[in-house]
């Protein structure tokens, strides 16, 4: 066992040869390297598989032995200062290593086909392998200096991967936005590291925790300064894990290839912030008020992420805001001190979200057959619908991932999310209400994505389709196709160009009621299809892309069994608590995570009921168009014309605008921060050109005219020179005489 731990230093370096060899090959033998490019995918998967097996072996030993291993090399700079580099293997490290490697392998296998026609295939796999190296180095770091080094490498890799298609201006802007936003958090992280080194004199985690605990216990430290340094450390996690208010980069990061989105959102970049807070939780827990601040940021992020997801048309952006909200649950759990629940949700969410992103990639891949390579169209749920019969495997797997994220048993996220929701009641009733309300919103917007993508009819085949924002709220286009900002008097579901509406599945016609309002830009306009006789249809992805999806389905189905929170007749089912025993004991002595069947079912019933209610609302509003037409009278009966109806329209449109415009936070930053910085830059440029350059140029001009003036006095006569000489000497003597007197 000891020998296994001694070789754990190799974990972050095993994937590193791939980017190095690809770079050397492209530099020295470009033609041969490109011709053998599929070989590099195999090497990437093979090396990461070795790391996965090594990590699983370490995890099994930790579950059985509950041990923590740290190895350090000292680099002595002088007698007063030395840097120590090493690696730390504990339950948190092994959990993160398994997440990174398992999801990384699935993403690499998936990418082999997804990126097969891309000219940047080799560059993609080089970036991905280096991304894995950076993240593995981060989770095995034994001190804050190593954390920061690999933290920056993770940020650099995310910059390269988000801007992978850098020739597209949108992608180039997105990677710059992610880079700049994360620099704000990283600068805070660096200042926090330096601040705690100034307080404790150590970068090592164990020494840092021990020294700071003693200083606080003996009241030998300034609490305000310590809290400020802790907030700076937390700022790094806020930016990296897309927590409010540094979350604005996350939806724009969807401009990268879909496999990148899966890796970033499941197991690498956004997970790094959660990992950092979990790693430093023994430090945060002894600092007054910082845990409350962490939980506050988490609960705000939960609510904002869920509300922003309600009106997104881009399937990947909808999933991105879902990630933001779920990361908020993890941050809330860490702020409440629910260490186990946070890590449990990190595990379950990682596999479910990877499944959803790879499923969305399969959908996008199939839609490109119809709309061409245009992310604005292939990722737009407005053009989707009716994909169930075309991509049945993708549809089923996406449905399972959706149900998991909604918290439906016995899927993975149900077990972890339910624990966090129950813990919130013990911490704060206000936070609990927000968390439970957002759980219902999660079920609503996730099934909205599912229904708009897979149910109904394939909307791209309606040639007169218009996507402009003039569709009423109450139609099937609710917050997904488009919505009218105008408050009209009456209500209708769909408006055709003639008063007869045709059902998709029958020839029966439906007459529009006279009270129905007219829509200038319809959601779907059904007219004659002209001379077109053939349509292209989406197709299921091939086995190389389906295999990772099916493997992630298995994880989504069964990974929740790791943390089943009850034991039965001496059989300990809660493997996760046993796995985390060393870390949990550092935080809570003799903590018992097991509960009885009755208590578990009582708590679960309420959370599942809320999720089912959200799903029901989504089905009611987003079911296929023909069903909505048949239920038009039912919906109309609930919404009568009058002042209440107008007020309801205003509220609904306000919520839609808030969600569609991301809470106007991006606009606020653009106006006050970006606009302010640009204004300051223009002012500085004006001051530099007019004042600084003006003084410099003025001295030169003054010297020129002074020289010209003196030159005009001298005409070449020696008598004039002598006269001026004696004149100035006389004046100088008079001045000296005056000063001496």
Swiss-Prot record:
Its EC number is 7.1.1.-. It comes from the Eukaryota. It is found in: Plastid, Chloroplast thylakoid membrane. The chain crosses the membrane at residues 9-29, 40-60, 89-109, 125-145, 147-167, 185-205, 219-239, 258-278, 290-312, 318-338, 344-364, 396-416, 425-445, 546-566, 605-625, 721-741. Keywords: Chloroplast, Membrane, NAD, NADP, Plastid, Plastoquinone, Quinone, Thylakoid, Translocase, Transmembrane, Transmembrane helix, Transport. It is an enzyme of class 7 (translocase). One of its GO terms (cellular component) is chloroplast thylakoid membrane. One of its GO terms (molecular function) is quinone binding. It holds the Pfam family Proton_antipo_M. One of its GO terms (biological process) is electron transport coupled proton transport. It catalyses: a plastoquinone + NADH + (n+1) H(+)(in) = a plastoquinol + NAD(+) + n H(+)(out); a plastoquinone + NADPH + (n+1) H(+)(in) = a plastoquinol + NADP(+) + n H(+)(out). It is a multi-pass membrane protein. InterPro entries: NADH_UbQ_OxRdtase_chlpt_su5_C, NADHpl_OxRdtase_5_subgr, ND/Mrp_TM, NU5C-like, Proton_antipo_N. Belongs to the complex I subunit 5 family. NDH is composed of at least 16 different subunits, 5 of which are encoded in the nucleus. NDH shuttles electrons from NAD(P)H:plastoquinone, via FMN and iron-sulfur (Fe-S) centers, to quinones in the photosynthetic chain and possibly in a chloroplast respiratory chain. The immediate electron acceptor for the enzyme in this species is believed to be plastoquinone. Couples the redox reaction to proton translocation, and thus conserves the redox energy in a proton gradient. This is NAD(P)H-quinone oxidoreductase subunit 5, chloroplastic. It comes from Daucus carota. The gene is ndhF.
